[in-house]
């Protein structure tokens, strides 16, 4: 290691004698740069990057549809893990290119970066794609790619491998009714891991989102791959109501603050923009999200179009509050308004500018103001058309703002007035006992589970805190994020014992802190995040034995009017075997989707009653190294998690081998 920092005479001579000349300049031709540095073009070589290839080909097909040249797109996932995407548009040009007279335009597009029809407004007024490098990048990173173009009764086809041409352009006779472009490709395992394959669910959801974004297209879906999910083998995907249909499928309509969805679909020729949006507000943030798109391309990091929408909504609600004389509206922030909102925004513009090759953020100038003006006009009309609706919405977001302000100002909260001052979503349902001895706080996720738990509890000794907001991974977050996270703030205020060096055992308001999450994988994930919080922010609380995990059942088994419960698949199998040995009567098996699905009586009997439940006490054998252990498992470095999993797998494998009777 020290040799790295030594500077001896020999090395000095090498530096002096070393000739840095033209021959040292490496020139990568054609698609070589893509294969050598794929991360520069698709953001990496992981599963997300590999799925960018599908997005690019699908974006090209959608461009044909949005331009009015295609109405049908087919997506087929094959047994061999390749994928075919077809659109019935004009078909990629096959005549020779003026700049490259010995090559067809098709070959130029597939083998040359920054080529295509998207650079000319005469061809596409709006277009997506990876800055014009997309289809050539797909070709470069594919083990095999076959393209077929149907034009004027002819079929033109050509094959490629790793960006290199395998065959010349072949022309055959075809039906004159056929037209369009078909691309079949398989990602190159030399670039991506051999274990990586396309995820049918991810691609199906991508196809649905594209169909929502453009009402004039029908996507024909076919999946030959065996999947263990609710993804259909075949489907016709079409949504005549666009984003309104999309939002309706994502939310619970009976949980809305105000009835209906604020939606619009406007084309402004003066601003050269086509805009569609759909927004609703729910009573909690369980389905809160903001999704935006530009020219059907998702922009997960937002951008100027999102800025315009947010300004419109904020200005609109503040103006309405001022109009009706509600001075509290002046304190609103956009975070208050979007806290429980579900938002989808889509725009079509000419020559969009994105940040980065993978287009995750729109940075086009001149977009924010037109979007703001259009949505503001419609939002003002939406609010003024129904006074009761507008007032309910305003009061809802003001209550969120007041909660935010109160959390900032409050430092000491007693049990007596905790519920009133905290204004926790779903309310902190506190116990009536004033001393902490014998009391329990159940931490649950969301109002649904919280509602069942509140009815099932013993009101004297058991309190229920539904966490409102996303549970943060404390191990990989900055101090600023931790301090500002809503769920963590709610929890620290309810416990009242302080954290880190400020932890005071005597101020802890409950004897037992019980994490009660769903019995499935998602519930285990939330529980692990909460344990991470306690290990890193309140290690003394864990060391003193206050932290527990509840064990709710995952399955309900009914036989001959008797009900039994099982916590997991293994326990269910053993229980069924036992029941069938005792009786041949039919067993009905039900799976709980979550705590909120359980009746209060069931939740009390299985999970909350002190004499009938099972609790797991959370502890660590090595408290001195807790920071390192948690950082290895929950921190920013995935290689440490991989090492842990690998070591545990070896232990498990050794055990299995030792038990084999060979």
Curated annotation (Swiss-Prot):
GO molecular function, one term: ATP binding
Subunit comment: Heterotetramer composed of ParC and ParE.
Site feature location: Interaction with DNA: 470, 473, 525, 641
Its biological purpose: Topoisomerase IV is essential for chromosome segregation. It relaxes supercoiled DNA. Performs the decatenation events required during the replication of a circular DNA molecule.
Residues covered by the Toprim domain: 439-553
Protein name: DNA topoisomerase 4 subunit B
Its EC number(s): 5.6.2.2
Residues that, per the record, bind ATP: 20, 60, 87, 129-135, 359
Organism the protein comes from: Rickettsia conorii (strain ATCC VR-613 / Malish 7)
Cofactor needs: Mg(2+); Mn(2+); Ca(2+)
PANTHER family: DNA GYRASE SUBUNIT B, MITOCHONDRIAL, DNA GYRASE/TOPOISOMERASE SUBUNIT B
Family under the similarity heading: Belongs to the type II topoisomerase family. ParE type 1 subfamily.
Parts forming coiled coils: none
CDD domains named in the record: HATPase_GyrB-like, TopoII_Trans_DNA_gyrase
Residues spanning the membrane: none
Reaction catalysis annotation: ATP-dependent breakage, passage and rejoining of double-stranded DNA
Residues annotated as binding Mg(2+) 2: 518, 520
Domain of life the protein comes from: Bacteria
GO biological process: chromosome segregation; DNA topological change
């Amino acid at each position: 290691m020290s040799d790295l920092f030594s500077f001896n005479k020999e090395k000095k001579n090498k530096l002096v004698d070393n000739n840095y000349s033209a021959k040292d300049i490496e020139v990568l031709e054609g698609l070589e740069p893509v294969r050598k540095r794929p991360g520069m073009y698709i953001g990496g070589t992981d599963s997300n990057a590999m799925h960018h290839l599908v997005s690019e080909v699908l974006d090209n097909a959608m461009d044909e549809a949005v331009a009015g040249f295609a109405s049908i797109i087919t997506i087929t996932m094959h047994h061999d893990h390749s994928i075919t995407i077809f659109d019935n548009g004009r078909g990629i040009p096959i005549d020779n290119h003026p700049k490259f007279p010995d090559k067809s335009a098709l070959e130029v597009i597939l083998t040359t970066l920054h080529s295509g029809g998207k650079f000319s407004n005469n061809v596409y007024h709006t277009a997506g794609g990876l800055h014009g490098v997309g289809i050539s990048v797909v070709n470069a990173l594919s083990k095999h790619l076959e393209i077929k173009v149907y034009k004027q009764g002819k079929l033109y086809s050509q094959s490629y491998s790793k960006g290199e041409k395998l065959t010349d352009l072949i022309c055959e006779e075809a039906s004159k009714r056929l037209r369009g472009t078909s691309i079949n490709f398989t990602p190159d395992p030399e670039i991506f891991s051999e274990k990586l394959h396309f995820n049918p669910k991810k691609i199906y959801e991508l196809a649905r989102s594209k169909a929502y974004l453009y009402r004039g297209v029908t996507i024909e879906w076919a999946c030959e791959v065996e999947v263990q999910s609710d993804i259909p083998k075949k489907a016709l995907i079409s949504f005549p109501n666009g984003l309104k249909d999309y939002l309706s499928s994502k939310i619970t309509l009976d949980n809305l603050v105000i009835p209906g969805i604020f939606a619009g679909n406007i084309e402004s020729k003066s601003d050269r923009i086509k805009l569609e949006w759909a927004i609703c507000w729910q009573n909690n943030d369980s389905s809160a999200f903001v999704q935006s798109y530009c020219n059907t391309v998702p922009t997960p990091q937002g951008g100027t179009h999102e800025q315009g929408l947010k300004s419109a909504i904020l200005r609109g609600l503040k103006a309405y509050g001022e109009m009706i004389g509600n001075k509290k509206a002046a304190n609103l922030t956009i975070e208050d308004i979007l806290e429980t909102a579900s938002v989808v925004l889509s725009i079509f513009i000419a020559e969009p500018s994105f940040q980065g090759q993978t287009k995750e953020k729109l940075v086009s100038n001149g977009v924010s103001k037109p979007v703001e003006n259009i949505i503001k006009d419609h939002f003002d009309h939406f609010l003024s058309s129904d006074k009761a609706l507008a007032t309910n919405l305003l009061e809802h977001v003001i209550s969120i703002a007041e909660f935010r302000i109160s959390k900032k100002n409050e430092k000491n909260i007693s049990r007596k007035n905790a519920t009133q001052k905290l204004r926790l979503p779903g309310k902190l349902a506190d116990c009536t006992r004033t001393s902490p001895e014998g009391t329990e706080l159940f931490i649950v996720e969301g109002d649904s589970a919280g509602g069942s738990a509140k009815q099932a509890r013993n009101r004297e000794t058991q309190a229920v805190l539904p966490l409102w907001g996303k549970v943060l991974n404390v191990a990989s977050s900055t101090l600023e994020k931790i301090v500002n996270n809503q769920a963590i703030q709610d929890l620290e205020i309810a416990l009242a014992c302080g954290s880190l060096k400020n932890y005071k055992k005597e101020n802890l308001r409950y004897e037992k802190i019980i994490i009660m999450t769903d019995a499935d994988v998602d519930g285990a994930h939330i529980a692990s995040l909460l344990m991470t919080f306690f290990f890193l922010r309140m290690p003394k609380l864990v060391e003193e034995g206050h932290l527990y995990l509840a064990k709710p059942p995952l399955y309900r088994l009914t036989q001959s009017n008797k009900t039994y419960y099982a916590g997991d698949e293994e326990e269910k199998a053993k229980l069924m075997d036992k029941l069938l040995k005792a009786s041949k009567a039919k067993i009905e098996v039900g799976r709980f989707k979550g705590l909120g699905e359980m009746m209060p009586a069931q939740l009390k009997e299985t999970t909350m009653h002190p004499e009938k439940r099972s609790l797991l006490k959370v502890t660590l054998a090595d408290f001195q190294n807790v920071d390192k252990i948690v950082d290895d498992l929950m921190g920013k470095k995935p290689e440490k998690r991989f090492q842990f999993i690998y070591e545990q797998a070896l232990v498990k494998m050794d055990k299995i081998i030792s038990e084999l009777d060979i």
